[in-house]
């Protein structure tokens, strides 16, 4: 799965940020991305394990991959629309 994280179109470093900042930054970044591009989010807030997948479901973007077994957490999302 780690290979999926090696070539994102965009990267967002949310290390040290706490809820709701990471999701707010993801939303702002995704808005500027063309459809189909990917965003790698790197975070250490435990709330992101719930918030990032929830954001993807609510906004109908694809959660391509996630690694949350150890810090830092990594999420790869693809903009769907």
UniProtKB/Swiss-Prot annotation:
GO cellular component: cytoplasm
GO biological process assignments: tRNA wobble position uridine thiolation
UniProt keyword terms in alphabetical order: Cytoplasm, tRNA processing
Major localization class: cytoplasm
Active site feature: 19
Lineage: superkingdom: Bacteria
Compartments where located: Cytoplasm
Cytoplasm found in the keyword field: yes
UniProt GO molecular function: sulfur carrier activity
Cystine pairings recorded for this chain: none
Pathway membership, UniProt: tRNA modification
Record's function text: Sulfur carrier protein involved in sulfur trafficking in the cell. Part of a sulfur-relay system required for 2-thiolation during synthesis of 2-thiouridine of the modified wobble base 5-methylaminomethyl-2-thiouridine (mnm(5)s(2)U) in tRNA. Interacts with IscS and stimulates its cysteine desulfurase activity. Accepts an activated sulfur from IscS, which is then transferred to TusD, and thus determines the direction of sulfur flow from IscS to 2-thiouridine formation. Also appears to be involved in sulfur transfer for the biosynthesis of molybdopterin.
Similarity annotation: Belongs to the sulfur carrier protein TusA family.
Subunit-structure text: Interacts with IscS.
Protein name: Sulfur carrier protein TusA
Species for this entry: Klebsiella pneumoniae subsp. pneumoniae (strain ATCC 700721 / MGH 78578)
